[in-house]
Amino acid sequence: MSIHQVMRYLPHRYPFLLVDRVTDFKPGEYLEAIKNVSINEPYFQGHFPIRPVMPGVLIMEALAQATGLLAFKTEEARNENQDKQQLYLFVGIDEARFRRQVEPGDQLHLRVELLRVVRGIWRFKAEARVNGDLVASATLMCAGKEIES
């Protein structure tokens, strides 16, 4: 999925859209995406000027956005909620771990796997890698919410 397709599903926009491209997915199973980390990201002005590092919470947010995309594509494949305007909200995080810093010039590879959906709560295994090395992981949860026009 190109950035244009990503933007059809996610409501996020600059500076908070943290998925640049979806490289692979299988509805109901997994989604892989990338985030190109540029020195031009606004958060690098203050985190940290001497040695810029992507904040861990933004790595988790990028993974959360990937979970929303997988939820949308899964519902779409099941032909569910087609006539509703839906938004997936980040509702939980467990076992978050940060193993390495992410710096300008890195390409963050995101992978989320659907574990289960119980009472409207989607649970995912989430990992972020740079050059094949694990930089962050967590179990993330999201929930769908119908948007009223």
From Swiss-Prot:
Keywords carried by this UniProt record: Cytoplasm, Lipid A biosynthesis, Lipid biosynthesis, Lipid metabolism, Lyase
InterPro entries, sorted: FabA_FabZ, FabZ, HotDog_dom_sf
Catalytic site: 47
Reaction(s) catalysed (UniProt annotation): a (3R)-hydroxyacyl-[ACP] = a (2E)-enoyl-[ACP] + H2O
Cysteines joined through disulfide linkages: none
Pfam families for the chain: FabA
The enzyme's E.C. designation: 4.2.1.59
One BP term from GO: fatty acid biosynthetic process
Listed GO MF terms: (3R)-hydroxyacyl-[acyl-carrier-protein] dehydratase activity
Compartments in which it is found: Cytoplasm
UniProt xrefs under NCBIfam families: fabZ (TIGR01750), PRK00006.1 (NF000582)
Family to which the UniProt record says this protein belongs: Belongs to the thioester dehydratase family. FabZ subfamily.
Protein name in UniProt: 3-hydroxyacyl-[acyl-carrier-protein] dehydratase FabZ
